[in-house]
Amino acid sequence: MKLNLQVKSAYNELKTKKDNSGKFYKTLFHIHTPQSHDYSLLEEWNYSEYQKKSDNDIYEVAKNKIKGIDCLKKSDIKEDSLKYGYSNCKEYLSYSILANELYLQEIGCVIVSDHNTIEGIKKLEKSIELLRSIYPNNIYPHVFNGVEISCADKLHVVVVFDNKRTELVENWLKNNIIDEKSGTYETSLNVLSYFSEKGLFCYMAHINSS
């Protein structure tokens, strides 16, 4: 009886204590957005197919995936795409479909690593924010900044950075990227060395298949 009281007392004490333990979140360490030159949106599409799709084609996909979007007029979607900084309806809806999938899969953290550009990061963050009202009780996907740099030796380097280092990465990309498809004339070793020396986290992508 005394032992039971001690156990009960210990249990009650643990219940009232503040939980200082960590929490696990589902995380995507490497994801591309419509900003990547080879983005395809759906698994069954390739890049060329996606490029040929019209605003209306992507709208039909969105209707099947995002709750309530079929209630919106296409004119309203077009207006929103411009209002929130997207290039067109197709891009706006593509980001919305991606953000919607992150909510459905209960992804807590995601590292955006588009090829040779960081322009897609803010667009994905905005789409996640805009869909919050549809999933008020779901885990909110936190976006980490990243970029996948295509190097001269055909290897790819992923660089992960916080908002304070955005300007550093932007300047490097501006000065060293030939174009978003070709990447940089620098070797992977030079890229790794530069960003590592600056205190940024970086690693070789697809190293087991390169």
Predicted regions and their residues:
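Extended substrate/RNA-proximal surfaces in nucleic-acid metabolism proteins
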Residues: 2-17, 24, 121-210
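Histidine-centered catalytic micro-motifs
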Residues: 26-38, 115
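Acidic/histidine-rich helix-loop elements
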Residues: 33-91
